[in-house]
Amino acid sequence: MNAPARAAAKTAADALAAAKKTAADAAAAAAAA
């Protein structure tokens, strides 16, 4: 695989991980409220 495609895949994976973390944090905040 070429470098640009690898970089795009990593960016997408990082964005997905950040979205999951944000959702988990929001759920924790809602549960604590």
UniProtKB/Swiss-Prot annotation:
Signal peptide: none annotated. Keywords: Antifreeze protein, Repeat. Coiled coil: none annotated. The keyword Transcription does not apply. Belongs to the type-I AFP family. Antifreeze proteins lower the blood freezing point. This is Ice-structuring protein SS-3. The lineage of its organism: Eukaryota, Metazoa, Chordata, Craniata, Vertebrata.
